[in-house]
């Protein structure tokens, strides 16, 4: 699992937006749960703002999460966590969440941090 790289997403990762959204939708259907829909533009913007975490196995998408702040940056949440099913059970979600926490602390050092499932 260490060969999978987890890092802050940027404009180079926009090509993964449709895959990310498809993976989230498939996971929700399998679980039979509703999930907040995110538009391609929203996910793309998170990448351009460097407020997203992506995990890649070479050039293959493995996982994703993003951060969102509110109340004048007093609060920050990580949300939209998804790990491709073939990569589950190996601690990848933990690595993505850890990177999201580090990014949150870097970007919003005084904020209270939450994890949200929507």
PLM ranges: what are they?
Residues 1-38:
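Short amphipathic alpha-helix that is part of the acyltransferase structural core
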Residues 19-23, 42, 95, 99:
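Alpha-helical elements of Rossmann-like donor-binding domains used by nucleotide-donor carbohydrate transfer enzymes
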Residues 7-9, 81, 86:
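Short strand-loop junctions, especially beta-strand C-caps/beta-turns
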Residues 83, 89-104:
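Conserved acetyl-CoA-binding loop-helix of GNAT-fold acetyltransferases
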């Amino acid at each position: 699992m260490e060969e999978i790289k987890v890092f802050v997403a940027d404009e180079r990762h926009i090509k993964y937006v449709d895959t990310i959204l498809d993976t989230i939708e498939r996971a929700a259907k399998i679980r039979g749960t509703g999930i907040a829909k995110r538009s391609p533009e929203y996910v793309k913007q998170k990448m351009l703002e460097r407020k997203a975490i992506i995990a890649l196995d070479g050039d293959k998408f493995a996982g994703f999460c993003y951060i969102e702040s509110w109340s004048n940056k007093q609060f920050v949440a990580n949300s939209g966590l998804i790990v491709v099913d073939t990569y589950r059970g190996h601690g990848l979600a933990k690595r993505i969440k850890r990177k999201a926490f580090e990014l949150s602390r870097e970007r919003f050092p005084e904020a209270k941090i939450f994890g949200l499932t929507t």
